[in-house]
């Protein structure tokens, strides 16, 4: 009788324990934590785990806060790196030794971000980020745009197109085509005035009218503004910021409006390329003729190509 009762009692005990676990999710959390702690304790006795703990600080990179530079004004932050001990150990355990290529990283965000800085123009991305961006200002040159768009698409490059509001109004289908291809759309004023000479009311009107035209036509609200000819004063920066737009300048100029030979344009750009470069161009014949070579050679130099938003993003690019 006793022998028959023992299995039944064990069954009842297990049943009530299981029921309690289902009723109490904290019990499951506790068991999970216990298992993890057990694994960690076991790993901590492994010389490989100890070696990993000792070497990990050598591979960590501190995050960089966004800042205002005396020369380059607003500079975006850049994520740091911290070794994920558990994931790295799991990979190394398969080979039984420390291997640098098995390190797994977690990204660490900076504490100061670009959007928290006082409004200043943005000339380039973070100097440690191996990415560059094409800034394509559009107020004319449709025939060259139609040559450039297929090249960008072929090489899977997304650029930031700064569109003049009046141009959008007169070129609805081409404006939609640019957006449909996945490019970022920015504000380039409504009719290309010298923004530095406008009253605050006229500055606001130029920005609002262009944003309204772009939103009405394409359905997106620009987050970046490029002043025509790069001409601005502090009020332009401040008013754009009030409208949730950053003011974008450049560090590399194709000077394509002077119609240089394609070889001259390419040398000009490639000799000045750098981490975080923002490359100004327009839809012109020399740019259309140079674009494919520029993309190929920029990539060959180890740079990624992205939009202004991607360039400003704090995410660290990993090889």
From Swiss-Prot:
Keywords linked to the UniProt accession: Hydrolase, Signal
Domain called NodB homology: residue spans: 130-306
Record-linked Gene3D superfamilies: Glycoside hydrolase/deacetylase
The keyword Lipid biosynthesis belongs to this UniProt entry's keyword annotation: no
SUPFAM superfamilies in UniProt: Glycoside hydrolase/deacetylase (SSF88713)
Superkingdom, natural source: Bacteria
GO BP terms: carbohydrate metabolic process
Keyword Signal: yes
GO molecular function: hydrolase activity, acting on carbon-nitrogen (but not peptide) bonds
Signal peptide (UniProt feature, chain positions): 1-27
Alphabetized Pfam families for the sequence: Polysacc_deac_1
Annotated family: Belongs to the polysaccharide deacetylase family.
Name used for this protein in its record: Uncharacterized protein YlxY
């Amino acid at each position: 009788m006793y022998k028959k009762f023992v299995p039944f009692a064990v069954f009842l005990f297990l049943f009530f324990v299981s029921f309690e676990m289902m009723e109490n999710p904290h019990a499951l959390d506790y068991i999970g934590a216990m298992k993890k702690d057990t694994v960690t304790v076991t790993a901590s006795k492994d010389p490989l785990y100890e070696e990993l703990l000792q070497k990990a600080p050598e591979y960590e990179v501190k995050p960089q806060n966004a800042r205002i530079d005396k020369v380059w004004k607003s500079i975006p932050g850049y994520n740091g790196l911290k070794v994920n001990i558990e994931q790295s150990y799991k990979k190394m355990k398969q080979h039984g030794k420390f291997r640098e290529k098995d390190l797994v990283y977690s990204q660490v965000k900076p504490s100061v971000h670009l959007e928290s800085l006082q409004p200043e123009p943005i000339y380039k991305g973070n100097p440690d980020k191996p990415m560059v961006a094409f800034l394509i200002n559009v107020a004319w040159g449709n025939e060259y745009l139609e040559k450039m768009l297929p090249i960008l698409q072929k090489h899977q490059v997304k650029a930031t197109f700064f569109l003049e509001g009046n141009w959008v109004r007169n070129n609805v289908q081409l404006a939609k085509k640019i957006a449909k291809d996945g490019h970022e759309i920015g504000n380039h004023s409504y009719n290309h005035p010298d923004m530095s000479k406008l009253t605050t009311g006229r500055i606001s009107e130029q920005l609002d009218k262009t944003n309204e035209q772009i939103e009405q036509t394409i359905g997106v609200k620009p987050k970046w503004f490029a002043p025509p000819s790069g001409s601005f004063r502090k009020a332009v920066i401040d008013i754009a910021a009030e409208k949730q737009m950053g003011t974008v300048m450049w560090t590399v100029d194709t000077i394509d409006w002077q119609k240089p030979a394609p070889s001259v344009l390419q040398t000009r750009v490639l000799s000045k390329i750098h981490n975080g470069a923002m490359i100004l161009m327009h839809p012109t014949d020399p740019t259309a003729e140079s674009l494919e070579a520029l993309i190929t050679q920029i990539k060959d130099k180890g740079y990624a190509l992205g939009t202004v938003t991607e360039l400003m993003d704090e995410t660290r690019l990993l090889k």
